Amino acid sequence: MTKREPDYLAGHTVLSLNFIRALRDVASEHQIPYLSFDVEHEVEFQGQKLTPFMEDFSLDYDPVATLAHVLSAADKRPHVISELILHPGFLDQFILQHSHLVYPRTLDVEMATSGQAIEMIERHDVQLVRYSELVDSAKA
């Protein structure tokens, strides 16, 4: 579809051991970095430590409070990448019928595009990083 290999493979949507093994095998076979998923533990990706934060499953989810939590963690552990996992984006019929994150997705978009979020990020002097940038830095 994109006429190039993906920058990395990750599969947190389907929590199946067989799926995860298959995804790791495909990543290995095609020499594509694999990003493991564990919201309860630090993970390593391309030589960097990542601490994931995904709180949008809670009933009282507040993405601004989650961002504040992530920024506080980043201040305390600057040598570790604090990974804020959001689910913003397009809502099609399949997602509307099957996702538990329909409402949190709208909250994520609102927060991620808000002036308040930008100001919070700037105040903490946080550098936003894409996974592809971690892949590129590991190759260098």
Locate predicted features:
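C-terminal domain-boundary segment and adjacent tail
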Residues: 98-140
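Short amphipathic alpha-helical segments and helix-helix/interface helices
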Residues: 20-24, 68-72, 117-118
